[in-house]
A protein has these predicted regions:
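Substrate-binding pocket helix/loop in short-chain dehydrogenase/reductase
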Residues: 93-106
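Conserved NAD(P)H cofactor-binding loop of Rossmann-fold oxidoreductase domains
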Residues: 85-91
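Active-site helix of classical SDR
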Residues: 117, 153
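C-terminal helical subdomain
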Residues: 177-178, 193-228
Length: 245
């Protein structure tokens, strides 16, 4: 079995790659930093005795050329899943951000993820026990001044996964979407953690593996964010507008 992990060289993606390799799955791991990706691939191959193909690809620009991924699949076991722990933010991401930064955020967090799905969807729909797993953010629950484009992209991605799950009903393909709170990665570095401490990525990676074929649709990690998802949208504007950080 082979899984494609987009964003697999650091943070959550790296933890997921480690977990899936430890369970004897072949991998294609993709990131923008080939040196780091090669190092991760080499370590996993030596440690777990599986095939791991490292590929370099920038998600910030479109169109995307996926021929190299297709060619890598020809030399591996059958494709079983597409896992997309992609996340990119910018400390200057506020309304009015420059066009270049805006499109980099939009393409990385939404457009490129959808293009990956569109490309491999016909294959995954035909094979048994396959999965597509996406990752959103609690930043998308209610937009604020900071992370404006990032949050909008993640909200759009959540909607896309809802449509995708509806589209593949009665097929062998499982579609899952994780709404992620603060976890211990570079995306949470520097964030205000007074109330919420970062959760561990290794634990989440284990949850992703163990539940990869469950048809739950959308879930939250940590679980308490489900309550916040319900409550935050109904906070009065007179109160919410004061949450600037």
């Amino acid at each position: 079995m082979t899984y494609i992990i987009v964003g697999g060289s650091a943070g959550l993606g790296r933890a997921i790659a480690k977990k899936f390799a430890s369970e004897k799955n072949d991998l294609i791991i993709i990131s923008s930093d080939l040196r780091d990706t090669k190092a991760v691939a080499s370590d996993l191959e030596i440690r777990y005795g599986v095939n791991v193909v490292p590929l370099q690809m920038s998600l910030s620009k479109t169109p995307m050329m996926l021929k190299e991924v297709d060619e890598a699949l020809e030399n591996l076991s059958s494709l079983t899943g597409l896992i997309l722990p992609v996340g990119f933010n910018d400390p200057n991401d506020i309304p009015g951000i420059d066009d270049k930064s805006f499109f980099e955020l939009l393409n990385t967090n939404f457009t490129s993820v959808c293009l990956f799905i569109n490309h491999f969807l016909p294959i995954l729909k035909k094979l048994p026990d396959t999965t597509i797993i996406g990752f959103g953010s609690i930043a998308a629950i209610r937009g604020r001044s900071l992370n404006a484009t990032y949050a909008a992209s993640k909200r759009a991605l959540e909607s896309y996964f809802e449509s995708l799950r509806h589209f593949v009903v009665n097929s062998p393909l499982t579609v899952q979407f994780y709404m992620i709170g603060y976890i211990d990665t570079n995306l949470s570095f520097g964030a205000n953690m007074t109330l919420f401490k970062p959760a561990q990525v290794d634990r989440l990676a284990g949850i992703v593996f163990n539940n990869r074929l469950r048809d739950f649709g959308t879930t939250f990690y940590p679980k308490y964010w489900k309550i916040i998802k319900i409550l935050l949208p109904i906070v009065p504007w007179s109160v919410f507008k004061k949450f600037k950080k």
